[in-house]
Design a protein with these regions (language model features):
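Catalytic Walker B motif of ABC-type/P-loop ATPase nucleotide-binding domains
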Residues: 170-174
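The feature captures the beta-strand-to-loop junction immediately N-terminal to the Walker
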Residues: 40-42
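Conserved ABC ATPase "signature" region
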Residues: 118-147, 189-192, 240
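A short, surface-exposed alpha-helical micro-motif characterized by mixed small hydrophobic
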Residues: 211-213
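Helix-to-loop junction immediately C-terminal to a conserved catalytic motif
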Residues: 55
């Protein structure tokens, strides 16, 4: 894919239909390089389906998705990853049967964790993996199985493995789900550090404090439609939109 100036991501009247049900109904969106966008809304609003279409996991019923100047409708997820579109999931990524270091090594070499890591890695690759773990304060857990490390560490590893190849855009699905308030604070700081590196971030989140602290723009979806696109300040002042968001099992702390 060719690199172009302008928006990093564009969605033009994107829709996903399951029979008569419109899971996503004509959503249009333009994301500039370096922006951080938070998406909220009730369960079933279409947020994850929207993410799945952007990342190539779910075919688009109508409309077009453009990434870095190229139409990507129908492009396989692994091709999008290598073009610079990284995606994490609500269920923490990584292989629990592997150590933290093995997961990081697999991401360094293969682009995503896969079984069998830790067997044929050279010294430079191991040094790179350890450097990334140190950057995310995970080096002390390098020999621990992913299943044995704390929730915050698993979230950090999820991000570290996704950004090791410096993606142009990072899609995060509920990144602070299951974290305690103090851990959310630490993850907010991590997201702000990624913003400082120029990585474009688009995330789905139910924790309002995280949404408003991290995002440049807040989008709210409801019944498959985009009903709000504005600043965090505008979102907090819009009582109608907030009522939709707060009705979605949202955590405010």
């Amino acid at each position: 894919m060719t690199e172009t100036a302008g928006p990093i991501l564009e969605c033009h009247e994107v829709a996903k239909h399951y029979g008569a049900l419109a899971a996503v109904d004509g959503v249009s969106l333009t994301v500039q390089s370096g922006e951080t966008i938070g998406i909220g809304g009730p369960n079933g609003a279409g947020k994850t389906t929207f993410f799945d279409m952007i990342s190539g996991l779910t075919p688009v019923s109508r409309g077009q998705v453009v990434f870095d100047g190229n139409a990507i409708t129908g492009v396989a997820p692994h091709r999008l990853f290598h073009a610079g579109l990284a995606r994490t999931f609500q269920v923490t990524s990584g292989f629990g049967s592997l150590t933290v270091l093995q997961n990081m090594l697999a991401s360094v070499v293969f682009g995503a964790p896969k079984a069998g890591a830790g067997l044929l890695f050279n010294r430079a690759q191991r040094e790179q993996a350890m450097h990334v773990l140190e950057t995310y304060d995970l080096s002390s857990l390098s020999n621990s199985l992913v299943t044995d490390i704390p929730a915050l560490a698993r979230k950090k590893l999820m991000v570290a493995t996704a950004v090791v190849h410096q993606p142009k855009i990072l899609l995060l699905d509920e990144p602070v789900s299951g974290l305690l308030p103090a851990e959310v604070d630490e993850f907010i700081a991590l997201m702000k550090s990624l913003r400082g590196k120029g990585i474009c971030i688009v995330f789905i989140e139910h924790v309002m404090r995280f949404l408003t602290a991290v995002a440049d723009r807040v989008l709210i979806m409801h019944q498959g439609k985009l009903i709000f696109d504005g600043t965090p300040q505008g979102f907090t002042k819009d009582e109608l939109v907030r009522s939709v968001y707060l009705g979605s099992e949202t955590r405010t702390e």
